[in-house]
Design a protein with these regions (language model features):
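Extracellular Ig-like/FN3 beta-sandwich strand-entry sites
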Residues: 114-118, 174, 238-242
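Short acidic/polar inter-strand loop motif in beta-rich domains
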Residues: 125-132, 248-257
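Low-complexity, Pro/Ser/Thr- and charge-rich linker/hinge segments at domain boundaries
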Residues: 25, 140-162
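Short edge beta-strand/loop segments characteristic of extracellular beta-sandwich folds
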Residues: 51, 63-71, 176-184, 192-197
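N-terminal edge beta-strand
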Residues: 32-61, 152-174
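Bacterial N-terminal signal peptides
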Residues: 8-17
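Aromatic sugar-binding surface patches on proteins
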Residues: 99-108, 223-232
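Short beta-strand edge segments in extracellular beta-sheet folds
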Residues: 136-142, 260-263
């Protein structure tokens, strides 16, 4: 998958290097689809839906909500969800690995967009079937540009986590949880304001959520996820316990946090 990201990223960088704003182009999707899901059939999925702005205020922080109107007991239960942005230099924004502790999956997050684009949510079942949901959003300038500040201080401050569970908790029912981790999520496409050299990619790669030491959700982040990654998702606690998260960045640093879940 990483190799495919790099191939598509190189192609897109060449294609978009002189473009800062353009209307969404549906013809880009076949290229992205072939790179990530070569020759695999994919069905439209009315059960994958979005809540998103028609035009985002900032391409660096585009709010996105995704819902899957099925449970993990359904015949075509989605086990893996890929979020792709057709027109981004690196299209894959994040991959979500789902479990039955999520019930009907509902997620709010924030992504980067370099230009107007279709956003794709591709769901994969345990037996490899693929299902597609799409939404069009207008936005610009979220992946490149210039950054400033003391890079050493920014890196030192990275990794602080907030993890909250909404109360009151009704055990056995969907319960909202919110995760935020402080991190610049450098894309590798941004330039230093002073030197004008490219700032190396520096981002959260993975986050693993557990409840009472049992998996809830694993996330593979890409640089298409916004600065200070934000997730709001529902999970189903059956008893009091501990919701925990373990995150890793591409420098190999590990960050941990947990919160009690109780009435």
């Amino acid at each position: 998958m990483l190799k495919r990201c790099l191939i598509v990223g190189c192609i897109c960088l060449i294609a978009f290097s002189n473009i800062t704003y353009a209307e969404s182009d549906p013809s880009k999707w076949p290229l992205v689809k072939e790179a990530f899901f070569a020759q695999r059939p994919m069905a439209d999925a009315p059960f994958i839906t979005f809540v998103a702005p028609r035009r985002a205020e900032s391409g660096a922080q585009v709010p996105l909500e995704i819902s899957i109107d099925q449970t993990q007991a359904d015949a075509n239960a989605i086990k893996t969800l890929y979020i792709l942005v057709d027109s981004n230099p690196i299209p894959l924004a994040a991959t979500y690995h789902l479990t039955d502790k999520l019930g009907k999956f509902k997620l709010a997050t924030r992504i980067r967009m370099e230009m107007d684009s279709y956003i794709r949510a591709v769901g994969e079942t345990a037996d490899g079937k693929l299902f597609l949901g799409s939404v069009e959003i207008r936005a610009a300038g979220g992946c490149g540009g210039t950054v400033d500040g003391d890079e050493n201080a920014i890196r030192a401050a990275a990794g602080k986590i907030k993890l909250n569970v909404e109360s009151p908790v009704k055990f056995g029912d969907a319960t909202p949880a919110t995760f935020i981790i402080k991190h610049p999520m450098r894309t590798g496409l941004q330039r230093d304001l002073v030197s004008q050299g490219f700032v190396p990619a520096f981002y959260i790669q993975k986050a693993a959520f557990t409840f009472n030491n049992e998996p809830v959700m694993n996330v593979d982040f890409g640089v298409g996820t916004s600065e200070d990654p934000y997730l709001r998702f529902n999970f189903i606690p059956s008893t009091p316990g501990v919701l925990a998260v373990k995150a890793f960045d591409n420098d190999g640093k590990e960050f941990n946090h947990q919160t009690e879940v109780r009435n």
